[in-house]
């Protein structure tokens, strides 16, 4: 039987089946003759054992019908004899050499073939099916090929050869352990399919850890030998990368064990209380993300997600191992621009500034402080200047008409009249004109009503109005002029000395109207000194009557130009705040003291 399996023929062919029947002690209907060169077949017993249909009462065979798998598709003995004749068997006359008595009462048939002999299964290769085509080939001297065995048949052939011959390996045997046995259970997951066509064994085995106890018995491959040469497995591993597993040292043949590759991905997810500390730098993040082996997740990991940008800019000392947000200290945010808020979990970067963020001094704050100091300095200098007082404008007999073509220029400085009265009036009013514009440029610069009550002093009197469009109303202007005359008379009673006069006109352009009963001037608004929507002042400087006004005009503009340059270095963003600060620090006398 085992000798037949080692023969490279198809086990499903008729010669192979006939060989197994003759050599099986189970069947008595077919056996060798006395010389071992022919077959003796008892027809009635053969039909009962092998040709009857499977079943408990089929044919009354003594061997038990249906015990052996079906060997022949036919149930006729004549068909079986036809198959013998087709493969070259010839019937021998009874009583000839090697004949014998039948085992039963029926007829006994004797067949002979020179390629079918006892203990010589290798001769079965020469048994050909003598069809018409094969006969023609044999007559022509051509070789008739036989059907080769399939993969399963080759596996059985290899198992048979392994059972008869000892294993010869190029690798050294295991150092300790008994002789390997051909049978034994094989762990689950050990077999790895190999697609090497030139390999005799279609399977290569990969061992599993020794603690895996789920096994199943090996049935079909229990006699599969390991080839005598070392082959390369399906993963492309060489003999130097395999080792003999001690797990299977006593389980038949030594199985090769695959070593770990550097590119092998192993996921071992287990809970651990140790924290994973994130290091600073993008290279560290990339290198750590590529290491999948033995990754231990942190048990303290929160639901917040920290992008790579945050991990790059935050130092490890201010980060609690992916468990809480970054400590809001000024040192940790020195180079951090964006921060992912863990409570919001938004997909866009959120700018985060801690509560104790140091407020840096900006240029705007510096300008504010400088402007405040400049205001106080100018106020102190104005305290020591000569007293300014509002006086009544003396009426003149001559009129001073001004052409509308001089719009946007000073009404007194641009007078081209050669009248001595107008010339003297222009010489008296021109020098002090820049004073009013300079003071207004840094004290009042708003288009809304000033809420703070300005303190009054004997030196300053402010007349502040909300910039509103002025219509052609003679009644309103006359009422305002009358109030101004009343105030001028009161101040003349206290200060009867002569003084110089500065007249600054405010408001948007308005048509010609009568200012006073004694003074008639056709004027237009000044655009080069003040905007049309700002306030105006009526300021006069009190001085000795003997001192000429031209000398005063030479010194005053120079002094206030310096004040204007200092005040215009930086404009205050909030003029109301400056006035409030000046009021609170009591730089000026209170209004009650002024009235007294």
Curated annotation (Swiss-Prot):
InterPro entries reported in the protein's UniProt record: HSF_DNA-bd (IPR000232), WH-like_DNA-bd_sf (IPR036388), WH_DNA-bd_sf (IPR036390)
DNA-binding region(s), chain positions: 10-200
CC terms in the record's Gene Ontology section: nucleus; XY body
A Pfam cross-reference name: HSF_DNA-bind
Residue numbers spanned by region Disordered: 541-576
Residues bearing the modification Phosphoserine: 572
Family: Belongs to the HSF family.
Tree of life domain: Eukaryota
Role noted for this protein: DNA-binding transcription factor that is essential for male fertility, spermatogenesis and meiotic prophase progression in spermatocytes under non-stress conditions. Positvely and negatively regulates gene expression to ensure progression of meiotic prophase beyond pachytene stage in spermatocytes. Plays a role in male germline meiotic sex chromosome remodeling and silencing through regulation of SMARCA4.
PANTHER family associated with the record: HEAT SHOCK FACTOR PROTEIN 5, HEAT SHOCK TRANSCRIPTION FACTOR
Entry's localization field: Nucleus; Chromosome
Subunit annotation: Homooligomer.
Name of the molecule in the record: Heat shock factor protein 5
GO biological process: cell differentiation; male meiotic nuclear division; spermatogenesis
GO molecular function: DNA-binding transcription activator activity; DNA-binding transcription repressor activity; sequence-specific double-stranded DNA binding
């Amino acid at each position: 039987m085992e000798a037949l399996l080692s023969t490279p023929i198809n086990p499903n062919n008729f010669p192979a089946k006939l060989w197994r029947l003759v050599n099986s002690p189970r069947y008595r209907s077919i056996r060798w003759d006395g010389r071992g060169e022919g077959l003796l077949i008892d027809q009635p017993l053969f039909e009962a054992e092998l040709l009857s249909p499977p079943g408990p009462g089929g044919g009354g065979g003594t061997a038990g019908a249906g015990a052996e798998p079906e060997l022949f598709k036919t149930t006729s003995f004549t068909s079986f004899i036809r198959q013998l004749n087709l493969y070259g068997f010839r019937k021998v006359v009874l009583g000839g050499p090697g004949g014998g008595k039948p085992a039963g009462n029926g007829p006994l048939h004797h067949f002979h073939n020179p390629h079918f002999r006892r203990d010589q299964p290798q001769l079965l290769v020469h048994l050909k099916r003598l069809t018409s085509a094969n006969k023609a080939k044999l007559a022509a001297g051509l070789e008739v090929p036989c059907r080769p065995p399939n993969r399963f048949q080759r596996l059985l052939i290899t198992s048979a050869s392994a059972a008869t011959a000892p294993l010869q390996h190029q690798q050294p045997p295991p150092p300790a352990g008994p002789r390997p046995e051909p049978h034994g259970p094989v762990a689950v997951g050990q077999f790895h399919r190999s697609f090497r066509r030139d390999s005799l064994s279609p399977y290569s085995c990969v061992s599993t850890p020794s603690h895996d106890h789920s096994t199943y018995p090996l049935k079909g491959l229990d006699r599969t030998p390991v080839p005598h040469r070392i082959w390369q497995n399906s993963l492309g591993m060489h003999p130097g990368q395999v080792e003999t597993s001690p797990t299977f040292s006593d389980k038949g043949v030594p199985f090769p064990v695959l070593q770990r590759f550097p590119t092998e991905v192993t996921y071992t997810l287990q809970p651990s209380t140790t924290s994973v500390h994130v290091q600073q730098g993008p290279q560290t993040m990339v290198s750590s993300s590529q290491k999948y082996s033995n990754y231990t997740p942190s048990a303290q990991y929160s639901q917040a997600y920290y992008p790579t940008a945050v991990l790059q800019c935050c130092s490890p000392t201010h980060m609690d191992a992916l468990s809480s947000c970054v400590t809001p200290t000024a040192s940790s945010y020195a180079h951090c621009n964006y921060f992912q808020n863990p409570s919001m979990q938004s997909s866009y970067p959120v700018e985060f500034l801690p509560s104790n963020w140091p407020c840096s001094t900006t240029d705007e704050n510096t300008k504010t402080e400088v402007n405040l100091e400049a205001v106080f300095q100018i106020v102190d200098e104005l305290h020591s200047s000569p007293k300014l007082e509002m006086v009544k404008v003396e009426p003149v007999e001559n009129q001073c008409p001004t052409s509308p073509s001089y719009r946007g220029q000073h009404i007194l400085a641009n007078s081209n009249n050669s009248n001595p009265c107008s010339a003297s009036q222009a010489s008296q009013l021109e020098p002090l004109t820049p004073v009013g514009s300079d003071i207004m440029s840094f004290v009042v610069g708003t288009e809304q009503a000033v809420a703070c009550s300005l303190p009054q002093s004997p030196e300053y009197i402010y007349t502040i109005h909300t910039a509103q469009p002025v219509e052609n109303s003679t009644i309103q202007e006359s009422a305002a002029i009358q109030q101004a005359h009343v105030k001028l008379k009161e101040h003349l009673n206290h200060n009867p000395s002569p003084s110089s006069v500065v007249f600054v006109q405010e408001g948007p352009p308005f048509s010609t109207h009568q200012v006073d009963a004694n003074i008639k001037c056709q004027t237009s608004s000044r655009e080069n000194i003040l905007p049309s929507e700002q306030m105006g002042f009526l300021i006069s400087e009190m001085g000795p009557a003997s001192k000429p006004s031209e000398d005063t005009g030479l010194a005053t503009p120079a002094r206030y130009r310096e004040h204007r340059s200092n005040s215009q270095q930086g404009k205050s963003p909030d003029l109301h705040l400056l006035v409030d600060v000046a009021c609170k620090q009591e730089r000026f006398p209170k209004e009650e003291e002024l009235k007294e």
